[in-house]
């Protein structure tokens, strides 16, 4: 006969939602502008625009470090 401690525990759905919100990211694109050092007219330099693609944390994820998210995940999901 198994004891209650040996049985696997169910994970709390609210905690799963919180963890999901803490690791949520969305794709972002922004424009990086820089001045061309070889532009012919120094008074009116050419501007080089480069699009940068990346990931951005959203909502709760912006306010919590990855280390703290790992700690919470280890504690809540065993």
Swiss-Prot record:
InterPro entries attached to this UniProt entry: Gp63 (IPR035341)
One Pfam match: GP63
Domain of life the protein comes from: Viruses
Protein name (Swiss-Prot/TrEMBL): Gene 63 protein
Organism per entry: Mycobacterium phage L5
């Amino acid at each position: 006969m198994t004891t209650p401690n040996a049985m696997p525990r169910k994970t709390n759905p609210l905690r799963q939602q919180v963890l999901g919100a803490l690791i949520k990211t969305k794709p972002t694109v922004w424009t990086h502008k820089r001045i061309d050092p070889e532009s012919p007219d120094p008074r009116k330099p050419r501007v080089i625009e480069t699009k940068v693609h990346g990931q951005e944390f959203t909502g709760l994820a912006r306010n919590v470090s990855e280390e703290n998210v790992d700690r919470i995940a280890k504690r809540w999901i065993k």
